[in-house]
Amino acid sequence: MYNDKIEIESPYGHITISYGRHNKHRVRVLDIDGGMESATYIEEELQNELLFEYMYLFDLMFDENYLEDRQINDVLLIGGGAFHYPKYFLAHHQGNIDVVEINKVLYDISNKYFYLEETINKFDKNKNRFHCYFENGRDYINRNKKKYVARVK
């Protein structure tokens, strides 16, 4: 099973799901048109942990040294990929996260292969902390009146 590749066509590119290792742990990888887009650990206890170093920079917005007496309750993420950061956010923070993803196929894949649905069920039982909007990110920002303390792209 872990040597298999899954190939999926979407309106926004050819998607490949494959398997590999990162620091001795099994991972599932999402590529779009040959470029790595996202990944997740397969072991249950690691599924909501960050795999990519740069994503820890996203989390600096929650560091008390950067907050300057403000609380981050609402975060907007443009582009969900395999929803790696939203899973981490739900598992490690108390606020709300909205994700704008133009490719609904990625959301469906994330639920099926990247543990998004399990994470939502575990950390957002009332279904009010995570929302996904399927549209162009710029259109969403231009149209939406909601104020976000943090926007991540």
Name each region found by the language model:
Residues 1-66, 91-92:
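Rossmann-like AdoMet
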Residues 47-153:
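The AdoMet/dcAdoMet-binding core of the Class I SAM-like
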